[in-house]
């Protein structure tokens, strides 16, 4: 099962949290969900060059709080905060509630699966050899402290007539272990030969390490032995 399902979705509530946190009545749930999808599409389109890793949406008391995780926060903020103000106005038109935007910097983009996948996709679009792009990404990720990395690319690799899948892995990637902190993301490279899909798994360690076995209690002296 761990080899087939999305590693992030399988670990929600265990080692991962939801990216949308809010409560809605049954009649309003679909509208709220559709608003979230529209906001995410808007942000991904507007912030295409800002290396956005993750977008969190919260709705506390008739307000909206959006947390954008990015490796290039300066691009989002803009000169004197002009870009973020324009972004807030656009999101307000979608959500119809006051919006508060927070930018959090991703300090190690090499350990973020989304940023690694997008970086590989950009290299493939620039016609870099896929094996070189995969190997370089794996080495950079392991150098930053990851315990294991797996990268898979699928499509007409190198302009081949028949599409195929190639993958490269170093270290451990225990997909069946629920306590394993595994980041997973996908990206698409639009090449002249067609679309090439990129998948990245990064194993950062175990979140809930098993507790060491309790030491056996020393035998207590009996009254007869004391006498």
Swiss-Prot record:
SMART domains: KH. InterPro entries: KH_dom, KH_dom-like_a/b, KH_dom_type_2, KH_sf_prok-type, Ribosomal_S3_C_sf, Ribosomal_uS3_bac-typ, Ribosomal_uS3_C, Ribosomal_uS3_CS. One of its GO terms (biological process) is translation. One of its GO terms (molecular function) is structural constituent of ribosome. It holds the Pfam family KH_2. CDD domains: KH-II_30S_S3. Residues 39-107 form the KH type-2 domain. Keywords: Ribonucleoprotein, Ribosomal protein, RNA-binding, rRNA-binding. GO terms for cellular component: cytosolic small ribosomal subunit. Part of the 30S ribosomal subunit. Forms a tight complex with proteins S10 and S14. PANTHER family: 30S/40S RIBOSOMAL PROTEIN S3 (PTHR11760), SMALL RIBOSOMAL SUBUNIT PROTEIN US3C (PTHR11760:SF19). HAMAP family: Ribosomal_uS3_B. Belongs to the universal ribosomal protein uS3 family. Binds the lower part of the 30S subunit head. Binds mRNA in the 70S ribosome, positioning it for translation. This is Small ribosomal subunit protein uS3.
């Amino acid at each position: 099962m761990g080899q087939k399902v999305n590693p992030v979705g399988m670990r929600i509530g265990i080692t991962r949290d939801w990216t949308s946190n809010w409560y809605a009545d049954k009649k309003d749930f679909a509208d709220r969900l559709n608003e979230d999808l529209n906001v995410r599409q808007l942000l991904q389109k507007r912030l295409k060059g800002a290396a956005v890793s993750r977008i969190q949406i919260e709705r506390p008391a008739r307000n909206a709080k959006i947390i954008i995780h990015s490796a290039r926060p300066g691009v989002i903020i803009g000169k004197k905060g002009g870009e973020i103000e324009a972004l807030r106005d656009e999101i307000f038109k979608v959500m119809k509630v006051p919006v508060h935007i927070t930018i959090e910097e991703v300090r190690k983009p090499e350990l973020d699966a989304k940023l690694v996948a997008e970086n590989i996709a950009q290299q493939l679009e620039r016609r870099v050899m896929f094996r070189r792009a995969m190997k370089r990404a794996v080495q950079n990720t392991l150098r930053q402290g990851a315990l294991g990395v797996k990268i898979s690319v699928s499509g007409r690799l190198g302009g081949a007539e028949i599409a195929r899948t190639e993958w490269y892995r170093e270290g451990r990637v225990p997909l069946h272990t629920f306590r394993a902190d595994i980041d997973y993301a996908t990206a698409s490279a639009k090449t002249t030969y067609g679309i090439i899909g990129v998948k990245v798994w990064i194993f950062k360690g175990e979140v809930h390490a098993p507790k060491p076995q309790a030491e056996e209690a020393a035998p207590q002296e009996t009254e007869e032995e004391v006498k």
